Amino acid sequence: GPTGATGPTGPTGATGPTGPRGPTGPGVGATGPTGATGPTGPTGATGPTGPPGTVEPNPFQVYVLAGAVGGDGSQANPFGTIQEGIAAVLPTGTVHILGGTYPISSTMVLNKNGVTLQGYSGSIIVLTAPVIPLVVTGNGITVDGLTFTSDNPYPVEFIQIGGTNHRITNNIIFGPPQPGPSDTWVVNRGFVTQSGNMTNLLVRNNIFHTMRQAAYLNPNTTGNIINNVVYNTRGFVNDEAIFVFSGNSWGIPENAVDIALLEGTITGPPFDPITELSENNSLATISDQR
């Protein structure tokens, strides 16, 4: 038969218990894309100019000017004495001895390897006392472009040199005139090697004149003496040393002897044959005392 009519809705039941809490979602969303860079702001005002800087002295390039006071050895503010320059320079550096007259009354000692004493036009060292003005030891030192002389004849050498591989180049070394024959003169000399303590000395392009001897080469020293001019002296004296002489020449007044080979000096090269030694040195007058 037919379905009967729907009965009335029953009353609402009681509310059921609250269900469990669901998981917490992420607190921060994903970072969005970076926005476009904004326009550059205007340049700020220039700040005040700082104080002037200073140039520190360079211990490898030291400058000396005769009579300067209160210097620091820089080119702009040089020392006043060569002694200050030698004290300040570091090994392998150069002491620039600018033009001027430098009176010397006490010995200057240079023993810093590789240092150059560099003279300039008018750089004159004047010895004013009976002392050796310059003693060189060590290795690889150069004395270049200086003039050495004295106010009176003193019985000393201008340069005493010992060590290895030194150079005496482009200098003028002379004494004041002395009366009478040269064998009566005060024994002043251009340079002297330290006995047994000078190896491979180069002496080149110097002028030696108006003193007892251009040089005294002590025993057991070696080197080369090349292209020098010597006059008004008693020449180079070789005392049991071994030096090569080549290209040297002799001026006027003539030397009493150009090269003297003292007793005990070796025979054979580099001295023999004597005729070749003479020919290789502008027909040198040689006193062979061996």
Regions found by a protein language model. Give the residues of each.
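Collagen/collagen-like triple-helix sequence repeat recognition
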Residues: 1-62, 73
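Right-handed parallel beta-helix/beta-solenoid
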Residues: 48-84, 101, 277, 285-290
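Glycine-rich repeat segments that build the extracellular carbohydrate-interaction surface of secreted
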Residues: 62-66, 84-103, 115-121
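Right-handed parallel beta-helix/beta-spiral solenoid domain characteristic of secreted/periplasmic
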Residues: 77-79, 114-161, 175-181, 186-188, ...
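Short, T/G/N/S-enriched strand-turn elements that build extracellular solenoid repeat scaffolds
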Residues: 82-88, 103-112, 132-136, 157-158, ...
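Parallel beta-helix/beta-solenoid
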Residues: 90, 112-113, 120, 137-139, ...
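Extracellular beta-strand/beta-solenoid scaffold signature
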Residues: 105, 127-135, 152-160, 180-195, ...
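Consensus "Asn ladder" position of solenoid repeat domains
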Residues: 146, 171, 205-206, 228, ...
